[in-house]
A protein has these predicted regions:
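Acidic/His/Gly-enriched intrinsically disordered linker/tail segments
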Residues: 95-103, 111, 116-210, 214-215, ...
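Multi-bladed beta-propeller domains
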Residues: 263-284, 312-328, 355
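Bacterial Sec-dependent N-terminal signal peptides
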Residues: 1-16
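Short, exposed beta-strand/loop patches in secreted or surface proteins that constitute
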Residues: 14-18, 75-76, 286-289, 308, ...
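Juxtacatalytic substrate-recognition/specificity segment
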Residues: 12-138, 144
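A flexible loop/linker signature enriched in serine peptidases of the S9 family
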Residues: 165, 169, 299-308, 322-327, ...
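Conserved beta-propeller blade repeats
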Residues: 99-102, 144, 280-296, 318-342, ...
Length: 355
């Protein structure tokens, strides 16, 4: 754990630890208040899963990072730990749940997923022989990403007053696609595309996980996570899903999409005239500002990095290509454009700056 921190952070940074019954938290000295808050969340989550399941949840190491300039979190079991980047997102896509609560619910759910996957007989034996490497490989190879991420998004929605599942913006792409009868194969939906607008595995997973819970009950997915990662055949997850539902993964996906299409089409929505260009490659024009007789927009597409464009009567002129953006927001004032980019530290991997 110390090696993980030292290898990527500024050496002079003083660290402290908090230890509870369910977690050992390593944090920068300046982040002690937030570490205490996270410790409380993890203790409550550990108690919740302890009451809900019979799975043994060991004390989990957690590393808090305060020198990164973007919002994220992760779980890995090589070595077994959670990592939090403490700076909250500013774009509102996570809803109004406190950032550290949302992060704790989501990432701790990933931890419990891996623990559930170790519960079947074959995986218990494999874990005893090869440890966390075996768990990492088996879970990663057998359980699709949409199930892992969708289950975590569903959990953050259920265990909080908000969560992404309650944010209208989160499912806007699927609403638009299904209302327009634009559907993709299961393989394309879970793998993504550089040609079409295909929502991420977070969005797909949330819909499929929620559909499974609504139709088959709240505990439906737990047994699939336990048995669907056992390497007793080439497609254990799909086989376990079929055992429970009579449907393959593809059939389950198609049935869920049919359900959501009917549901979304019943919702009220207004039609608007499309003023943007119809392009072959998915493209977004973000936060346009009026400039003289034209517009200044941040253009993002699959075949070009983010750039500022001046748009006049549907004619485009590129102003400037950008680096790694902190977010998509910018300001135009007094003939000057102001935006923020992330600049990585040349020595320390987990340190970066906003310029």
């Amino acid at each position: 754990m110390i090696f993980v921190i030292i290898a990527v952070s500024i050496l002079a940074t003083p660290y402290k630890t908090i230890e509870t019954a369910s977690a050992r938290i390593v944090f920068e000295e300046s982040s002690e208040k937030r570490a205490q808050e996270i410790a409380n969340y993890i203790d409550k989550l550990n108690e919740y899963y302890g009451d809900k399941t019979e799975i043994k949840l060991n004390k989990i190491p957690i590393v808090l990072r305060g020198q990164d300039n973007y919002s994220n979190g992760s779980y890995t079991n090589m070595p077994n730990r959670l990592e939090y980047i403490l700076i909250p997102p500013i774009n509102g896509e996570m809803g109004v749940t406190p950032w550290l609560m949302d992060l704790s619910i989501h990432e701790y759910r990933h931890y419990t997923q891996f623990q559930m996957a170790r519960e079947n007989t074959i995986n218990k034996f494999g874990y005893a022989l090869f440890g966390n490497m075996y768990s990492f490989l088996m879970t990663g190879l057998t359980i699709p990403n949409w199930a892992i991420e969708g289950d975590a998004v569903s959990t953050e929605t259920e265990l909080s007053d908000n969560g992404r599942g309650r944010v209208p913006d989160f499912l806007k792409d699927y609403r638009a696609l299904l209302i327009e009868n634009k559907e993709f194969s299961y393989e394309k939906a879970k793998s993504g595309s550089f040609k079409d607008v295909v929502p991420t595995v977070y969005h797909l997973g949330y819909l499929l996980i929620s559909y499974g819970k609504e139709k088959y009950g709240d505990e439906f997915w737990d047994s699939i996570f336990v048995n669907g990662s056992s390497p007793n055949n080439f497609t254990p997850f799909s086989n376990e899903l079929k055992k429970k539902t009579g449907l393959t993964s593809t059939e389950f996906y198609l049935e869920a999409m049919k359900y959501y299409k009917e549901k979304f089409k019943k919702e009220k929505f207004e039609e608007y005239e499309q003023v943007s260009l119809k392009l072959d490659i998915p493209t977004n024009y973000r936060y346009s500002f009026k400039y003289k007789n034209s517009l200044i927009s941040l253009k993002k597409s699959y075949d070009e990095k983010a750039s500022f464009y001046e748009i006049d009567n549907r004619n485009e002129k590129k102003i400037l290509g950008l680096g790694i953006l902190s977010d998509d927001y910018f300001e135009l004032k007094n003939n000057k454009i102001i935006w923020a980019e992330i600049e990585p530290d040349l020595r320390n991997e987990k340190v970066n700056y906003s310029n």
